[in-house]
Amino acid sequence: MSTNPIQPLLDVLYQGKSLSREQTAELFSALIRGEMSEAAMAGMLVALKMRGETIDEISGAADAMRAAAKPFPCPERNNNPLHNGIVDIVGTGGDGFNTINISTTAAFVAAAAGAKVAKHGNRSVSSKSGSSDLLAQFGIDLTMSPETASRCLDALNLCFLFAPHYHGGVKHAVPVRQALKTRTLFNVLGPLINPARPEFMLLGVYSPELVLPIAKVLKALGTKRAMVVHGSGLDEVALHGNTQVAELKDGDIIEYQLTPADLGVPLAQISDLEGGEPAQNALITEAILKGNGTEAHANAVAINAGCALYVCGITDSVKAGTLLALATIQSGKAFELLSQLAKVSGEAHVNGQERGR
């Protein structure tokens, strides 16, 4: 199919000018439909990268991908005063560190503490073991149907949504992204296109320069409340140093720093959080969720779960959130939740409910 309809938009980019939100959505819609050549795709991504993507351009790309995503049937939002919305705990990846699966493990803890967590994840980007790599170790079906995932969210407070299962059109960009061998707009899009459309987000970014822009994008996309964080090199709240935060609340964005002391836990070394292959990380996650993890592992997970609990309104401060997360870890409830999710996932698969996707 001819790429002529989008050529004028590409020409704008090649001239070093920016596109509107609607124009960017039009370009990315063409990409998702498979109507853009790989050469044009590479040109578009490089032109955006070299100039630096605007808030409108990131928002427009997210609009297109959200619109094209496989629908997710969200359970009733307001059937419980505590559950005034869904939260995601997610990072861009690509921070260059091979840590344990902090955000994935934190999702179990936050859910066991009362949050409704719909975690949007993919296979590994920078570490040896991404969210989906870890879940597979526990027998959690990465391709469970949207209906089964929704039932898990309703009954267990938690579901995991495997990005490629909901965003099939992204496959057209894979060869180009692999050939370019550099970060592109796609590296920040993943956390922005959760098909559950969470009202609340704890979103970690790989660069401190992205913290404020991504908070502005979340505001543009209609996110109710969020913390965008970069923790001393990590795409999550840091246990080994300061965390830069841009918090979106009531339509305003405020910037500040958090230290481990602010969260009520001692400083640790980044080496204390080193991860391994999926099988090794699964053992670490299991130990943490049973309350048997190292102090550093438990605290790293708790400060991230705690910030998520704060963002979705279950606690009124990040420190209170961290304390609730630590108590939840010690109770073993988070591991019970993991076991229940694996059981439901396995039963759905065996019963054939996952066929015909």
Swiss-Prot record:
Binding site for anthranilate 1: G91, N122
UniProt keyword annotation of Transferase present: yes
Binding positions (Mg(2+) 2): D235, E236
Cofactor detail note: Binds 2 magnesium ions per monomer.
Top-level taxon in the UniProt lineage: Bacteria
Keyword Phosphoprotein: no
Gene3D superfamilies: Nucleoside phosphorylase/phosphoribosyltransferase catalytic domain (3.40.1030.10), Transferase, Pyrimidine Nucleoside Phosphorylase, Chain C (1.20.970.10)
Catalysed reaction equations from the record: N-(5-phospho-beta-D-ribosyl)anthranilate + diphosphate = 5-phospho-alpha-D-ribose 1-diphosphate + anthranilate
Gene Ontology terms: cellular component: cytosol
Cofactor(s) the record lists: Mg(2+)
One Pfam assignment: Glycos_transf_3
UniProt function note: Catalyzes the transfer of the phosphoribosyl group of 5-phosphorylribose-1-pyrophosphate (PRPP) to anthranilate to yield N-(5'-phosphoribosyl)-anthranilate (PRA).
Oligomeric and partner information: Homodimer.
Protein name: Anthranilate phosphoribosyltransferase
Origin species: Shewanella baltica (strain OS195)
